[in-house]
Amino acid sequence: MIQMQSYLDVADNSGAKEVMCIKVLGGSKRRYAHIGDIIKVTVKDAIPRGKVKKGEVYDAVVVRTRKGVRRPDGSLIRFDGNAAVLLNNKQEPIGTRIFGPVTRELRSEKFMKIVSLAPEVL
C-alpha cells in the first residue's frame, strides 16, 4: 500500500537507489497504490554516472509491497520491502535488468517486459 511521501527501493539498474512517491495516478481521489499500479516518483538517491539523476521525476510501476497481494485461491504474497521499476514516457522500463522477484499480477500487456527481465516470478 503505497501513498504520497512513501519511499521505495528501485528494482532495476537505471541508476536510482531510492525514490519517493509524489502522486498515485488514476483519479484525483485515489489514495493508495498496490502491485502493478503506476505512480509518479522523484529520485531521492542515485549512483554516480547512472541513467537518472537525483531530483528528476519519473513514472514507476510498483513491483513489491510490504502489504502484499491476495490471490484468488486465498494465498497472500508479501515482501520485505516496497520496490518499484522506473518507466520512461512510453511506459517502458528505463533499466535493462530487474533485481529481485516480481509477482504474476504484472503479467498484463503493459508490463510483460518487466516480467521477462525478472529473475523470478512468484
From Swiss-Prot:
Gene: rplN
UniProt superkingdom: Bacteria
Cited CDD domains: Ribosomal_uL14 (cd00337)
Record text on subunit structure and interactions: Part of the 50S ribosomal subunit. Forms a cluster with proteins L3 and L19. In the 70S ribosome, L14 and L19 interact and together make contacts with the 16S rRNA in bridges B5 and B8.
Protein family membership: Belongs to the universal ribosomal protein uL14 family.
Keywords of the record: Ribonucleoprotein, Ribosomal protein, RNA-binding, rRNA-binding
Pfam families in the record: Ribosomal_L14
GO cellular component term of the entry, any: cytosolic large ribosomal subunit
Protein name per the record: Large ribosomal subunit protein uL14
GO BP, sorted A to Z: translation
PROSITE patterns with a match to the protein in the record: RIBOSOMAL_L14
SUPFAM superfamilies: Ribosomal protein L14
GO molecular function term, any single one: large ribosomal subunit rRNA binding
Purpose: Binds to 23S rRNA. Forms part of two intersubunit bridges in the 70S ribosome.
